[in-house]
């Protein structure tokens, strides 16, 4: 009887430790790239909802592309329903196409795709890509390239649902083999088949790749650029606004 009680106490203690670990995530916000379509398989849709719930369980807010359709709509709704903050960033031109019905959370309208990606990156502590098309792939590869260049050191996660990204991974391995991508840069991508496993890996992530340029050098260059591009005669208020817009994306 005492052995049984002791076992139960240990199990309860382990559950408390696990719950505390979830509450103490290193991330405040994670940016999720995903399709504006739901995809052919139900597993893609299930993964989007599951990812949203996993973010909620870890008290992490969502940054995403702002749409209410496709996988974007599913993951944002799951996070919002769980009581976490949602920030959607979307170009005004895409609003009629990617927003239908009621939106959730905070919607930031921007002028174009470049501003969208910069704002999403600026707001986030890490990145995750769900299945998606050209847009998702472009967003994913850009943050990978930025990490390789040393612009940021934020984790980049790939949720490889049902092997969706196997062909992309084969291409990257081929590029490493042909010496277009360095072996160390292959470690930029954090890979997992489920949201829970991916979040656990992202929490433990530490950069292992060789950066082309140190991050500090990028930041110093940016500060120098902001100062050199001041417009003579510009009012202080407007000058501060422009400099803020040129400020750190990441």
Curated annotation (Swiss-Prot):
Binding site for substrate: 98, 116-117, 133-139
GO biological process, one term: cytokinin biosynthetic process
Tissue distribution of the protein: Expressed in roots, leaves, stems, tiller buds, shoot apex, immature inflorescences and flowers.
EC number from the UniProt entry: 3.2.2.n1
Record keywords: Cytokinin biosynthesis, Hydrolase
Catalytic activity: N(6)-(dimethylallyl)adenosine 5'-phosphate + H2O = N(6)-dimethylallyladenine + D-ribose 5-phosphate; 9-ribosyl-trans-zeatin 5'-phosphate + H2O = trans-zeatin + D-ribose 5-phosphate
Listed GO CC annotations: cytosol; nucleus
Its biological purpose: Cytokinin-activating enzyme working in the direct activation pathway. Phosphoribohydrolase that converts inactive cytokinin nucleotides to the biologically active free-base forms.
Protein name (record): Probable cytokinin riboside 5'-monophosphate phosphoribohydrolase LOGL6
Organism of origin: Oryza sativa subsp. japonica (Rice)
